[in-house]
C-alpha cells in the first residue's frame, strides 16, 4: 500500500536524471525511506531499532542537503519545492 505510493516519484526522477549517484536522487530516496518509516511508527511506536535507523537516515539526508545548499542554491530550492519539505534544519 505505502510502497506503491512512492514508486511513481522515484521513476519520474530516474527518467529525468540517469545518475543514481546524484545528490538529488539520493535525497529523494532518503525522503521516501523516511516517509515509509514514519508511517511504520504509527503502527509500531516502540520499534527503537527502526527509530535509530531513521535518525541515521535523517543525518545523511541533512548532510546531503547542506552540501547541495552550499554548492548550488537553485537546485536545492527546486528539490525542496518538489519534495514539499521544510528546510529550517539545514545548516
Swiss-Prot record:
Keywords: Chloroplast, Plastid, Ribonucleoprotein, Ribosomal protein. GO terms for cellular component: chloroplast; ribonucleoprotein complex; ribosome. It comes from the Eukaryota. It is found in: Plastid, Chloroplast. SMART domains: Ribosomal_S15. NCBIfam families: S15_bact. Part of the 30S ribosomal subunit. Belongs to the universal ribosomal protein uS15 family. This is Small ribosomal subunit protein uS15c. It comes from Cicer arietinum. The gene is rps15.
Amino acid at each position: 500500500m505505502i510502497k506503491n505510493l512512492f514508486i511513481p516519484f522515484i521513476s519520474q526522477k530516474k527518467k529525468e536524471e540517469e545518475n543514481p549517484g546524484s545528490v538529488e536522487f539520493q535525497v529523494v530516496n532518503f525522503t521516501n525511506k523516511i516517509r515509509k518509516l514514519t508511517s511504520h511508527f504509527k503502527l509500531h511506536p516502540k520499534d527503537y531499532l527502526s527509530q535509530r535507523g531513521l535518525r541515521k537516515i535523517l543525518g545523511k539526508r541533512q548532510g546531503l542537503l547542506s552540501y547541495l545548499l552550499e554548492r548550488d542554491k537553485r537546485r536545492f530550492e527546486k528539490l525542496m519545492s518538489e519534495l514539499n519539505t521544510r528546510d529550517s534544519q539545514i545548516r
